[in-house]
């Protein structure tokens, strides 16, 4: 970034904002890069501002029992706020004085007042000087207030972020991500621009009092008629506002429903295509859209009348003020024109400025109170560690996640002790205690010595993660003692990847040790993965490790924990995403060898891990079921297998957690997070649902990204659980959009209660967030000294061979710390923003306007009609002026003022009636025409929005996956949320306002030009100057706005990243570093926003300067060319003053229109996406006719109509090559094999080898080459829809959309209830559905949060059975299941798909044993394709992965004694199946 010219700018340059000229010139000539943006002034840095406010807030906390945040803000900003308020008031006062001089100028034309005529020229000079003074006062004042608002926002942003990192986990349990984002965006954004209006809460009343005094002097009591009307008008507008809010609230629920379905569709677009559900989803969404648009039109009409009321109120104000006076004393033109000018100012003060100011204070104080409450939340407390101990000890530890239960626990226990003394009832305590809440851990005792390995196992929800959280201090014990040395390293069960390089993620701020680093890389099996990257371990990872597989993310997280030199290592199910072979190698080389001398606590349930552990702790429902060695476990607890049921590899996922609230860390951010709800909780929350989707969505966030969802940071209590749980293998950033898309656009959908402006939700970015905030600094003090900005030292390891693509800016200090400079790596930033900025021009093209206007044929006629009415209005106005100029006047004796009978100044009583009749008649006609003009325009523009939404939805659904893979999910969602909201809400009325203002200006200029043709000569160059200045400014401002909008992304993304890894951050003590990164993100945004505000003020000031010149010309032309006794000067000057404010408003509206039209450009970009080939046309035609066929009819000349295809399920694959995007690297190369009908084939390969990719290639979801045949029919000779219908799919990412059970099973409504129940019975789903009220009509929300992952997979099975598929594709169906539920699915597979071809991708060996053939994929190619016997006889990957016990299961005859126990375990599983059916929810 460049150094800001502001630092060296002169006072004059600062006053006129001339220092922004270089960036304006550069932006006009070329596209702006981030390197062109100026550095922020040091006073605006987040470090300085946050430190200042934090100091005052701490002072407030220390000095008062009831601290007020507003007091801290007052001490920081009050005097500057007051100073700019006084400037603003003085500027507003000049507006009230201007009409006085205007009246004197008109009065100077009175023939009897010759003395005044001589000073008219001086009065004109004074009037012009008032405009100059007003310009010099208002713009610095407005900019100063915007600047203060920006500083307040930055300081509070930082304060909130710092507080977030300190919040206790119990508080986090009650706060959703959506609430935090709303706190940062919706609330704090009010300060930036709203602060400039705050002073009008006292300025407007003073101004009204001054104006009424001046009007009273002119019109006496008549003055209050106009004021009364304005007050009534303000109340009327308030009433319209309430009505509009009612419609908006109703509409927000409908929007939420649509966006929920749309979000689910986008996130699961691959499943939608695999199931051939494109038309079904389109119909569902369009039906919701239709209902939404009815309310949209009502709200738009109310807003239209509200806006029109302001435009058309001017006539009534003047009319009501002047009429009583004119009827009594006649019309005095001087007083009329002066009153008109006063009323213009008065109308603005009463109907706009004061209501806006009141609303600003209301919103601001509300936001401050919310932030104040947040800042007083309970903070995380670190445990007091015993640094002398070497062991880890827990003694009688009991804990609750629910806040306050600890105190109740002690009280109940005390009462229990008192009662036991009297009645001896030992069980009384826990009978009382059950009323208080369930402890997540009860009476836990264990002791492990230094260097020992403790394996913690247990069933789902047993409290294993809570145990680790207790040791880390995240969960406070209600009773008992915990002792350990305090140096802890932690690996979360959900792999958390910090945006940065692989090396930075592993080192994570610890001093760099090459030998240790290489040892950890090797032990965690990362060497091979890293070697595949061109940049090796310096490759930049996206947010959440978007470019990595789940297994790679898990190994990096484990490596981070192992690299840190600690006394105690807490490993929470670190092997979740690893294949069997990799897991085995890492456990041996890393956990058992590399960490052999360290104390380790490992959450696991694998038998091999339990055997190697020094001690084993088995938890069951929060209690210690067993503690001891493995041999003791076998002797004392022979039934321990049943306690591990429902666990196995499922442990690392939160899908089935039922009891504890926070035990599964950041549940909503898990890659496979289902709703952890118990059956009792299900009844509390889910049985209240109705058929209306919106009933359970009162607190949803509409992502604008995002994402339309309320993501809880932790699992919420049953009454709070309104969030959405995702079954997603995709990283979070593919689903969660927390920041606005970088494209320009102001409107979004924040909360369900209101549609307003604010940030929209956005998704993953290609580059690291740290790219946005840091820049490499060469080693050496000399370079560092060149950086004038402040630096902040944080701990981070240095690296050798730094390149300019490095994320961190670093300098090795003696304390192995890091100096992060304020410099930004522009190249990385440019690359990071490239996606958002490309292919959207800085200024909306004329082609976009033309395409938008011609989209609906009625729109052109409406615009022509508007022009015709405008011409009629101008003609009527000229007629009125002609009548005024030619009104006959009475004799001198009959005139009101006997000394004057000139029509230029006085019109008599008799003529006044005549004039007013004409004026009122014409004005009423114009009002009626005006309303008639606007309504059709607004109505038609909403219809255009409807068409654009339909076209875009259709294009997205029909786009190939290769195209969709290049887009960000949040970016797509923003089109349907933010951009459609702009098209619905803002664009129609903004276009109406612009057209209205433009016509007013043109009409005023036309009238003035008719009265004084010389003025027209002055008008032409002024209008030309306006157009050129607008074009010059717009080119730069839109780019700055685009950069500013993109600059918001790192702020919210960094917040989410920090929250996702909050426990890891605390365990590693990295809060200060992440605070620094957050300040970097804030400073980046501030640089763009401050420059945008400055250039905007430059533009506004130039507009005023041009007008001042124009007004000077008009004033002197009028004074010098108006002859004796003519009164047209009053009309000319009054209209000229009106032109000033209206033309500025019109120019600003044109800029708003251009900004909002960028949303149209983005929508057109999506509409123009390519479509998949082979799309049947019959269904499309049926849809266009408003009817959606229940059965899709596809003609295929290669298949006889009498045949049922596919009949057997035989597959032949020849030279299959697959790529994710056109021109990308091949993921699979030259795959060839064949599958016999009814055969079961297992896919084997290491993590990331391409197993899931092969299944996607079968469905033609990727760019593929080669050939596949099913029963002799090639995929090239059949339509895409029919090809996909041949497959049944159970994907990793189970798709349950918001809708009934029936709709989820049969979206095309092809099957009767009897057929659906029959299939549900076949797959074991009937008992699940019957437990819900409404059964098939029960509405599933939040991704089916009331269902376990196993039940969701059963629904996928049911869909496949209903589709009559002959080939079934299963992608790791057991990855998130306990063995019991998986047994149910295996049984369903055997029964429902006995004669089908099954292709299974699975990590669990037991699940693969039923396959006849195995396809081993290695290095993107087929390595082996053989039966299981051949693979076991060779040194294959399968043989390495399978354990001896699994081989015994395969060949029981080789060792019958070892196999005897198998039937017992199998029978145990069978016994529990029915129990699972009843309790699995």
From Swiss-Prot:
A single cellular component GO annotation: membrane
Keyword DNA-binding attributed: no
Residue location of crosslink Glycyl lysine isopeptide (Lys-Gly) (interchain with G-Cter in ubiquitin): 688
Superkingdom, taxonomy of origin: Eukaryota
Positions of post-translational Phosphothreonine modification: 717
Name this protein carries in UniProt: Cystic fibrosis transmembrane conductance regulator
ABC transporter domain segment(s): 423-646, 1211-1444
The keyword Oxidoreductase appears for this protein: no
Annotated ranges, domain ABC transmembrane type-1: 81-365, 859-1155
Record text on subunit structure and interactions: Monomer; does not require oligomerization for channel activity. May form oligomers in the membrane. Interacts with SLC26A3, SLC26A6 and NHERF1. Interacts with SHANK2. Interacts with MYO6. Interacts (via C-terminus) with GOPC (via PDZ domain); this promotes CFTR internalization and thereby decreases channel activity. Interacts with SLC4A7 through NHERF1. Found in a complex with MYO5B and RAB11A. Interacts with ANO1. Interacts with SLC26A8. Interacts with AHCYL1; the interaction increases CFTR activity. Interacts with CSE1L.
Gene Ontology biological process terms, A to Z: bicarbonate transport; cellular response to cAMP; cellular response to forskolin; chloride transmembrane transport; intracellular pH elevation; membrane hyperpolarization; multicellular organismal-level water homeostasis; response to endoplasmic reticulum stress
Ranges of biased composition (kind: Acidic residues): 1471-1481
Renumbered ranges of motif PDZ-binding: 1479-1481
